[in-house]
C-alpha cells in the first residue's frame, strides 16, 4: 500500500516504514504528525484518487530528526570586470518515518 501526500508545496509518494526528508516542519523530534492532505491512496486491489484530496484518509509519521542539507554554491561572475560573487545555501529539512496509512 502506498499514498501520495502533499507537504511543503511538494508531493511525495510514501509507503509504511519509509523514511524521507521533507521541508522543515515545526514539530519536535520524537513526536508524531498526521498528514491529511492525501492526494492518492493505492493498494493491490484499487486506487483512490482525491478531488483534490481523498476524504477520510490520513498518513501518520514519526519525526526522526531535523537537519540541514548539503551546501549549494551560488556563483555570479561578471566577465571582463574582474569581479565575482560567491555564496552558499543549506536548506533545513525534517526527516520523518511513515508509520501508518489510513484509507
From Swiss-Prot:
Any one Pfam family match given in the protein's UniProt record, by short name: Ribosomal_L21p
Domain of life: Bacteria
GO molecular function, a single term: rRNA binding
Keyword entries, A-Z: Ribonucleoprotein, Ribosomal protein, RNA-binding, rRNA-binding
Subunit organization: Part of the 50S ribosomal subunit. Contacts protein L20.
Biological role stated in the UniProt entry: This protein binds to 23S rRNA in the presence of protein L20.
Protein name per UniProt: Large ribosomal subunit protein bL21
Gene designation: rplU
Amino acid at each position: 500500500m502506498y499514498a501520495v501526500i502533499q507537504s511543503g508545496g511538494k508531493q511525495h509518494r510514501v509507503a509504511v516504514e519509509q523514511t524521507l526528508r521533507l521541508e522543515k516542519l515545526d514539530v519536535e523530534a520524537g513526536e508524531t504528525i498526521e498528514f491529511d492532505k492525501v492526494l492518492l491512496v493505492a493498494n493491490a486491489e484499487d486506487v483512490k484518487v482525491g478531488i483534490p484530496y481523498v476524504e477520510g484518509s490520513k498518513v501518520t509519521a514519526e519525526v526522526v530528526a531535523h537537519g540541514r542539507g548539503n551546501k549549494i554554491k551560488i556563483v555570479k561572475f561578471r566577465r571582463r570586470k574582474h569581479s565575482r560573487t560567491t555564496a552558499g545555501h543549506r536548506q533545513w529539512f525534517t526527516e520523518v518515518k511513515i508509520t501508518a496509512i489510513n484509507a
